[in-house]
Amino acid sequence: MVLEATMICIDNSEWMRNGDYSPSRFQAQADAVNLICGAKTQSNPENTVGVMTMAGKGVRVLVTPTSDLGKILACMHGLEVGAEANLAAAIQVAQLALKHRQNKRQQQRIIAFIGSPVKYDKKVLETIGKKLKKNNVALDIVDFGETDDDKPEKLEALISAVNSSDSSHIVHVPPGENALSDVLISTPIFTGEEGGSGFAASAAAAAATGAAGFEFDVDPNVDPELALALRLSMEEERARQEAIAKKAAEESSGAENKDHASSSNADSVMAEAEPASNAADDKKDQPKEDDDAQLLQQALAMSMEEGSSGAAAADAAMAEAAVDDQDLALALQMSVQDAGGSSQSDMSKVFEDRSFVTSILNSLPGVDPNDPSVKDLLASLHGQGEQEKKEDKSDKPEDEKK
């Protein structure tokens, strides 16, 4: 890759207002300048490019040789068109700018766009060419626009004077449908002395056409704020779309869950309905069994009524017998009293036997014979038994006395 420092001379004279090159001569020239600047900076990172004008209020350097492509492209905006181009003065100023380049190892090159008539004589141009050759400065000329009889001859003489080892080139571009930049892509002015590579050519073309190779079609070197704003806007839009897609997915999953829940509820209702129907069927089968049970209960009730009526009749008969025979009634009463007294005496004897009572209490569930309350109860019963014995003993002597 050739290491170069290049100065591009732009023709911004009144002749650039014509529209024989689409959209105008000046705009076509600006597109071609952008193309060449991109090609130079892309072919070698250390290459530098400067831009200057040849008309207007005078020759003026817009940008000194630099590798900042954004700065180079930005200087093309807002240029004024007017007056006449001064080719000789422009070449001399460009030579001085290249002489003061920072990297002295860079080769020097001047590219001049000439779209207006050339007013200088051939001898003057040859003198300028020899001076460039002496200082090892290469010259490329793009001839377009006005075509008088002397212009091509003068420019050819200039290139012949400066040419050394075919390092200088001239390209004549007639008016036509093809853009000026499209014609220059296939020329040595664009590809360089080594012919260039396809990668460098495509990258340079993308960079020079203003943004074809940049994201959002905006060169961040020219307008970094706009490029950042577009990038942020794109990220926000992407995040918004992702949020919408996520929400839609959640809603669809929620609807599926609701459908599943409703189907499960329906299944549970069906499951509950089946036992209910089975219970109804069981109830239909139960009336026969219930009727049999009712009949049995009625029979038992009748038998109990008969038994109670028989007992009542027996009691009535006994009552009548008692009335008829008072002596028998008195005997019965005395026997009952004797039986009651004997039973009470028997019960008192049983409670007097503490070992027997303790064994009975041990056999009862949940009863503790050692409980204080149980002991107090047994003691009270035992005391009552002893008191009854004393009363019986006291009653016997009185009976004997009688």
UniProtKB/Swiss-Prot annotation:
PROSITE patterns according to UniProt: UIM (PS50330), VWFA (PS50234)
A GO CC term attached to the entry: nucleus
The UIM domain, residue ranges: 221-240, 291-310, 323-342
Domain of life: Eukaryota
UniProt subunit comment: Component of the 19S regulatory particle (RP/PA700) base subcomplex of the 26S proteasome. The 26S proteasome is composed of a core protease (CP), known as the 20S proteasome, capped at one or both ends by the 19S regulatory particle (RP/PA700). The RP/PA700 complex is composed of at least 17 different subunits in two subcomplexes, the base and the lid, which form the portions proximal and distal to the 20S proteolytic core, respectively. Interacts with PI4KG4.
Biological function: Plays a role in maintaining the structural integrity of the 19S regulatory particle (RP), subcomplex of the 26S proteasome. Plays a major role in both the direct and indirect recognition of ubiquitinated substrates of ubiquitin/26S proteasome-mediated proteolysis (UPP). Binds and presumably selects ubiquitin-conjugates for destruction.
Similarity comment: Belongs to the proteasome subunit S5A family.
Protein name, as recorded: 26S proteasome non-ATPase regulatory subunit 4 homolog
Species assigned in the record: Oryza sativa subsp. japonica (Rice)
